[in-house]
Design a protein with these regions (language model features):
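Conserved NTP phosphate-binding and transfer environment spanning the P-loop NTPase/kinase superfamily
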Residues: 1-140, 144
Length: 146
């Protein structure tokens, strides 16, 4: 798998406009366990924002994981989706990301030296940003902080 990742990094280095990478979570649920996002054909609304973002037009707010759509960036016309639920969908909680980072670390470790250094570096940068976001500013630079 590490060789596969390296292959695509090599291909990406040869193209003039490498593809952008986006993360989505279609499966966020509310307190009753119901999906917040309607899914299916409505996923095109998110894909439209992604294409707008690639063209430099999609509105976003910077977070520790990258640009996230603003509340009004994704067309919700005709959807029964409140600002509160949309906010829940778009929320980036660094504390939740700590678990994701740990799982990613396990995956990267499985591939040992065959995991491309570029991917390890991206992972380490993300982990640092998340750690900094959950570490109170007065602890940065002290034991337990960054």
């Amino acid at each position: 798998m590490g060789d596969y990742f390296q292959h695509w990094l090599d291909v990406g280095a040869q193209v003039t406009r490498p593809p952008k990478i986006f993360r989505v979570n279609w499966f966020r649920t509310n307190e009753n366990g119901r999906y917040l996002w309607p899914g299916f054909g409505d996923n095109l609304r998110v894909l439209k924002w992604i294409l707008e973002r690639c063209d430099g037009k999609g509105k976003a707010v910077d977070t520790v994981i990258g640009g996230v759509p603003t509340l009004d960036a994704i067309d919700r016309s005709g959807l029964a989706l409140s600002d509160t639920d949309m906010g829940r969908l778009l929320r980036v909680d660094p504390a939740e990301w700590v678990e994701a980072i740990a799982g990613q670390e396990e995956l990267l470790h499985m591939f040992g030296d065959r995991m491309p250094k570029e991917l390890r570096g991206e992972h380490e940068q993300l982990a640092r940003r998340i750690n900094a976001a959950i570490t109170p500013p007065d602890l940065v630079g002290r034991e337990g902080g960054e």
